[in-house]
Every structure is written in structure tokens, then in C-alpha cells.
């Protein structure tokens, strides 16, 4: 199978230029003009369009068991929806139950993901600590291509990682060359505020953001960053949603600390007024953690992207239908938190970022693809347009439009947080492994076509930190 994309303007994270791209055997074989290609190659006309690396979503939760139910989007439907939106790879999460073997959970998630329509990888969550966990982390890194571990600082009495677990796991990540990531919310404070609001009779979705104010995220971000600084490991903060958390990242980076921030498309656009909707079901549809924030935080997050202190855009794609959300009808803390977005992320970011002048096209590529590939050691196999890279590409029509709606999206959920928004700039074609899987509204996703992509431990940042540590190595005082 071979494919020639002709006439498009190639846009990468650092340049744009006119050239044709020839793909065969799932990879990019040649880039240039007037390419000599074999007869019979499929030809796409990219005139007037941009050819960019396929999107990589570093934060999804397909088919996740949580709060007594299971996310409505499975690995096939979710990755297929991603292809319709220009996303050609995801990094999902293995979340072991407390006391469950990490390896057992990993193989369980691998089995679920075999139906994926696009390439995928995993972060593995550390939900408890023991010598077994410590050893299995090494097994996952050395034999299963895991180079990042997730820590939930929220969800008390469930999967929350207390400080002793953070310290032990961060230390182990440093030894293994794996990146620790954190969901930064103070779980003790959230639990306290949830009970307090319930006692006051505030039981609806409007209580959700009140139980998780911006200070809760700011404190946890600060704590995680300080722990990482003390131990000497890099740190990646998922779904940064507040100015307070961004300020902590910015300060740490100003001192040379390798801290990376991720922002969700929804947090860039929506504010907490959505929880005041008079219809309970609609308000509950927006419940996710961290919640959408008061006005002002959105501008701060855009500035974080522009300044380089936020590095990736994601979705935290975790779908629960209205019937599932109804479990919290009388207690907001029992509403399964999660929203969709994998199909919409790239178009929303283009419309609100590039079209508004907030971001350049090169910024867009970096934030939707290349930076994730670099941070999690997928680059240049992913996130790049160069000979030898995977032929995961999106042909982008800057004049194309789409009105987002749950009635027409491909995501397996009955709600869309961007409902009714018309975006300008959409994928006309998506290419995965050199095969056209989305063509002008025709979704050609294939169940099981996705591959598990191993991500080896990443030495670059860790070598740097090791040199720093050696220079400041403490010594005993001779007496």
C-alpha cells in the first residue's frame, strides 16, 4: 500500500514549506517535489491545505472502570473518533486497583486495547506502594515500553497517592529514567469540602467546582513540584486548569527545573458557569476533575501556551452517558467525572488558537503532537514529517467548517461540552500508518489496526539531572 500526498504545504513544529510526501509500508519514504513514485500509488490532492503530523493525545481514559461503572467509550470507538478529528495516537492510562499487581493491570488494559483503530501507549498509575510495586515498575520500563507513571493526588479512599507514595515512586522513577506525572488536586481538601457542602444541602453539580477550588490545585501542584525538585526528577502535570498551578510551573521552570504542563481543550474555552445550568442533566454533563474554572483562568492558560510554560494539549477523554451521571442525582460527589473531546481537540485549538492569532501554525503542531512525542520519547517516530517517521498525518483544510454536536460526533457519548460551536479549520483527511482512515467525512477506521507503541526510558533529561546531582553531591564532614 502506497500513498502520495501532493500539493500541500507541510507544517511542522518549526517550519513550513511546499513539498509532496510519499508513504509506503506505513512510513514516510520520500519528501520533495516531482517525486518518482511507483505506479498504482493512491494520490491525495492537498492543494490549498496544510499537511501536519497526526495529533497525539497524551491523556485519554478509554473503557476505564471507575466509581462502579465503566467509561462508555471503548478503545475502538474512541480511537476511531480520534481519527475523525485528526488524532492518530493516544497515550491512555493503566489504573490498578489498590493492592493489584501493576503487571496484571497492564496486561488487562493491553487486552482491552487490542481493538484500537490507531496506535496507542500507556502511562501506568501508582495507586499503592510496596516492594512489589517497586519491582514491577522496573519490569514495565525494561520489558514493556513504559516510561511514565501517573500519581493521583486526589480521590481519597480510592486511588489517591499520599506523600509517602509520591516520594517513593518519584525516587524509583529517577532510578529507572521514567517521567512521573501527577493529577494535582489536594485530595484531603476535596474530601473535606465535599462533606461540608453536602451538610449545607448543596448537593447538585454546582457544588462540584466549589469542592475543588483553584487553591486545591495550586497547593498540590506546588507540593508535587517541590518533591520532584528535592528528589531531582522531572515532572509532568496533567490537565493544568488554574493560574495558581501555572504560576508554580512557571516559577519552577524559571529556576531551570524540568517541569512540563498539559492543558485540556475544554479548560481553554469553558468556565464554571456551566454548572449553574437549570437542567441537572446538562450541568452534570460538564462534571470533570478538575472542573471548569472561573473566568480569568482561561486567559492565563492561553498565556501559558504562548510563553512555553505549558507544553501539550490533551482531552482527558473519559465518557459517561447521562444514565451513568445520574448516579449522583442526590450527591454530586457520586457523579462520575469525565467528558469527551478526542474528536474535537484539534479543531477547537485551531479555531480558538490559530484563527484568533494566539498561536502560530507551528505552535499548533508542537502543542497537538510534537511536544508530546518529545516528552514521552516517541519522537521522531511520531510528531514529525521526515523520512522514516510513521506515516501518521493529517491534511488540514483551513477553510473547512464543522458545527460540533453530540448528534453528529463519532464519540460514544450523548453529550458534548462544545455543543453548537462552529469551528473553522478541520481535517479533510487523516492518514494512519500510511492508510487513509478519514476522507471528507467518511470514517474508514479498522478495528484492531492500532499498534501498541513501546516508549523506552528517556535518558536525555535524566542525564542532565544526573550531572547536576553529581555537582551538588553532599559529603560527610570529617571530624
Stretches with model-predicted labels:
Residues 135-313, 318:
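Histidine/acidic residue-rich metal-binding segments in metalloenzymes
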Residues 440-479:
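Intein/HINT protein-splicing elements and their conserved insertion hotspots or analogous self-processing inserts
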Residues 327-331, 387-453:
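C-terminal cap of metal-dependent C-N hydrolases
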Residues 111-126:
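A glycine-rich helix N-cap at a beta->alpha junction
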Residues 206-234, 285-286, 306-313, 319-399:
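His/Asp/Glu-enriched, well-ordered alpha-helical/loop segment
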Residues 1-53:
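Histidine-rich, glycine-flanked metal-binding segment
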Residues 8, 26, 48, 59, ...:
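Divalent metal-coordination and catalytic microenvironments
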Residues 46-115, 132:
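Metal-associated gating/positioning segment near the N- to mid-region
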Amino acid at each position: 500500500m502506497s500513498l502520495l500526498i501532493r500539493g500541500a504545504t507541510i507544517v511542522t513544529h518549526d517550519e513550513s514549506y511546499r513539498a509532496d510526501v510519499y508513504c509506503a509500508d506505513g512510513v514516510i519514504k520520500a519528501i520533495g517535489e516531482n517525486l518518482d513514485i511507483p505506479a498504482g500509488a493512491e494520490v491525495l490532492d492537498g492543494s490549498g491545505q496544510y499537511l501536519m503530523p497526526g495529533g497525539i493525545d497524551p491523556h485519554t481514559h478509554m473503557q476505564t472502570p471507575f466509581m462502579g461503572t465503566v467509561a462508555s467509550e471503548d478503545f475502538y470507538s474512541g480511537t476511531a473518533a480520534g481519527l475523525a478529528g485528526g488524532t492518530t495516537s493516544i497515550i491512555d492510562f493503566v489504573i490498578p486497583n489498590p493492592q493489584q499487581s501493576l503487571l496484571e493491570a497492564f496486561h488487562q488494559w493491553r487486552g482491552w486495547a487490542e481493538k484500537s483503530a490507531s496506535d496507542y501507549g500507556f502511562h501506568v498509575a501508582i495507586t499503592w506502594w510496596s516492594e512489589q510495586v517497586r519491582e514491577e515498575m522496573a519490569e514495565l520500563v525494561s520489558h514493556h515500553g513504559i516510561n511514565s507513571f501517573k500519581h493521583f493526588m486526589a480521590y481519597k479512599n480510592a486511588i489517591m497517592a499520599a506523600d509517602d507514595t509520591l516520594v517513593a515512586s518519584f525516587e524509583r522513577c529517577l532510578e529507572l529514567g521514567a517521567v512521573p506525572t501527577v493529577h494535582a488536586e489536594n485530595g484531603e481538601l476535596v474530601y473535606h469540602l465535599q462533606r461540608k457542602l453536602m451538610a449545607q444541602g448543596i448537593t447538585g453539580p454546582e457544588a462540584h467546582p466549589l469542592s475543588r477550588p483553584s487553591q486545591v490545585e495550586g497547593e498540590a501542584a506546588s507540593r508535587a513540584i517541590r518533591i520532584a525538585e528535592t528528589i531531582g526528577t522531572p515532572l509532568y502535570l496533567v490537565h493544568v486548569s488554574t493560574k495558581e498551578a501555572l504560576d508554580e510551573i512557571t516559577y519552577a521552570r524559571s529556576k531551570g527545573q524540568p517541569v512540563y504542563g498539559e492543558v485540556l481543550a475544554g479548560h481553554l474555552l469553558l468556565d464554571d458557569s456551566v454548572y449553574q445550568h437549570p437542567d441537572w442533566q446538562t450541568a452534570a454533563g460538564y462534571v470533570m476533575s478538575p472542573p471548569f474554572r472561573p473566568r480569568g483562568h482561561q486567559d492565563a492558560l492561553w498565556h501559558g501556551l504562548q510563553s512555553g510554560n505549558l507544553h501539550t494539549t490533551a482531552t482527558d477523554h473519559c465518557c459517561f452517558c447521562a444514565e451513568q451521571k445520574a448516579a449522583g442525582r442526590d450527591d454530586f460527589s457520586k457523579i462520575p467525572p469525565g467528558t469527551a473531546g478526542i474528536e474535537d481537540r484539534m479543531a477547537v485549538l485551531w479555531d480558538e488558537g490559530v484563527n484568533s492569532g494566539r498561536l502560530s501554525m507551528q505552535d499548533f503542531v508542537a502543542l497537538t503532537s510534537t511536544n508530546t512525542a518529545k516528552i514521552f520519547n516517541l519522537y521522531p517516530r511520531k510528531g514529525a514529517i521526515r523520512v522514516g517517521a510513521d506515516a501518521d498525518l493529517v491534511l488540514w483544510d483551513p477553510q473547512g467548517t464543522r458545527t460540533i454536536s453530540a448528534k453528529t460526533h463519532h464519540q460514544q457519548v450523548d453529550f458534548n461540552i462544545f455543543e453548537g460551536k462552529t469551528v473553522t479549520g478541520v481535517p479533510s483527511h487523516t492518514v494512519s500508518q500510511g492508510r487513509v482512515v478519514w476522507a471528507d467525512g467518511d470514517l474508514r477506521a479498522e478495528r484492531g489496526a492500532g499498534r501498541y507503541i513501546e516508549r523506552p526510558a528517556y535518558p536525555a533529561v535524566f542525564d542532565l539531572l544526573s550531572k547536576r546531582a553529581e555537582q551538588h553531591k553532599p559529603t560527610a564532614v570529617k571530624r
